[in-house]
Amino acid sequence: MSDNKVEVDKRRTFAIISHPDAGKTTITEKVLLFGNALQKAGTVKGKKSGQHAKSDWMEMEKDRGISITTSVMQFPYGGALVNLLDTPGHEDFSEDTYRTLTAVDSCLMVIDSAKGVEDRTIKLMEVTRLRDTPIVTFMNKLDRDIRDPIELMDEVEDVLNIACAPITWPIGSGKEFKGVYHILRDEVVLYQSGMGHTIQERRVIEGIDNPELDKAIGSYAADLRDEMELVRGASNEFDHQAFLKGELTPVFFGTALGNFGVDHILDGIVEWAPKPLPRESDARMIMPDEEKFTGFVFKIQANMDPKHRDRVAFMRVCSGRYEQGMKMHHVRIGKDVNVSDALTFMAGDRERAEVAYPGDIIGLHNHGTIRIGDTFTQGEKFRFTGVPNFAPEMFRRIRLRDPLKQKQLLKGLVQLSEEGAVQVFRPLDTNDLIVGAVGVLQFEVVVGRLKSEYNVEAIYEGISVSTARWVYCKDERKLEEFRRKCSQNLALDGGDNLTYIAPTMVNLNLSMERYPDIEFAKTREH
């Protein structure tokens, strides 16, 4: 077995998806604790203690206690090497989140057991459906009062259209939370509160019929036996093939804050989640065990190092292996580049990568030449597909307090749009600059970063734009006519792609009827 194959088989690359405040960043902390990457998990928003969550590292994130930028963390667990991509969890950081989901092989969905399925979770699940990504589910916050577990699973099945197979089952909740029963292992793991910061030995009782269980939890033992009869009859058994197709999700219960149940999830991911998968390109399917290196960029992050105004492109390795100093072919611009200083990450702490395998994420220093979606190979000319731009849902006009800095403003906006922080549109008929985002917080981030990184003071004004669509037409003559007649609604985006800026949905629908040969697209491949 080649070194490459051994390394590929070890890798598990996943992201965590959840609604804001369901406990995603806490789980990230605890997962790293189990991977020995952190000795003491700093509870998130732990402002009093001055210990900030490891994965929230940009200034604004430190101020607000939210993870704005996707961080990457690699750690060993149970004989595997796990790559965890932390995704922005707050209301508004969705486009980055969407794109991160294109770089993973499986996802962990975290649900607040008091609330059930919430709208951001629904949106993110739609994105995972584009590639039928396998999903593992964690019902969190069992140390609080929760909804009925069977009802929670029914809701996941109905709303997200995925079958649920319980792997662990809760015994009580809130102040009466006693632990979980691991259905596949036939063992009860008992919970003790106040042990969230470190990994402690838990008491395990083997066998649901063990009299020790009655001694330990009293009448809860008999209740559990009755409940399990019902659960076994009413729920799906775990089916590995259905899981790999994205049709069924194994469900775990626990509390991330109490560091309870997190090891069960990790065991499940290592045992069941797929190793790095083949990837589609516009030429052929790329297999992870191919000899030659390939990879694609799914995110660009500015300012990872406050001492340098650098930008780092995050690349998923898809085949072959990266070695320090190797030559890569940057397909879009047709140039070869020598890469001697790629990085591996532990959220803001960076180390030089000497070698990286399929499933790993490496960072390339970017001086403005790399864009989201770029493919790198060892000479072959093809492009990985499936890293889209999503049409913004909110728009603002942006203008300067000091008109002499127009050049810096445009430079800053184009760089921020290449990085995916925001989208920028330049209308054909005016000198306006329009900024588009998927959520309000992105606008704040952009103004803050323009000031700190480009020394530009910008302000927003309202603008009557409802939505945007990228426009295409195979017939050049028809496209030119459309351009002439609709120029007041057309703009170029940060990559100079023609975009229709619609003041209302009615206007968009009328234009689509009037120009049937023009394609109005909601997403655009990079």
From Swiss-Prot:
Similarity comment: family membership: Belongs to the TRAFAC class translation factor GTPase superfamily. Classic translation factor GTPase family. PrfC subfamily.
Source species of the chain: Shewanella sp. (strain MR-4)
A cellular component term, taken from the record's GO annotations: cytosol
Lipid metabolism among keywords: no
Alphabetized GO MF terms: GTP binding; GTPase activity; guanosine tetraphosphate binding; translation release factor activity, codon nonspecific; translation release factor activity, codon specific
tr-type G domain location: 9-277
Binding site for GTP: 18-25, 86-90, 140-143
Record's subcellular location: Cytoplasm
The name this protein goes by in its record: Peptide chain release factor 3
Gene Ontology BP annotations: regulation of translational termination
One protein family per Pfam: RF3_C
Entries under InterPro entries matching the protein: EF-G-like_DII, EFG_III/V, G_TR_CS, P-loop_NTPase, PrfC, RF3_C, RF3_dom_3_sf, RF3_GTP-bd
Keywords, comma-separated and alphabetical: Cytoplasm, GTP-binding, Nucleotide-binding, Protein biosynthesis
Iron in keyword set: no
HAMAP family for this protein: Rel_fac_3
Functional description taken from the UniProt entry: Increases the formation of ribosomal termination complexes and stimulates activities of RF-1 and RF-2. It binds guanine nucleotides and has strong preference for UGA stop codons. It may interact directly with the ribosome. The stimulation of RF-1 and RF-2 is significantly reduced by GTP and GDP, but not by GMP.
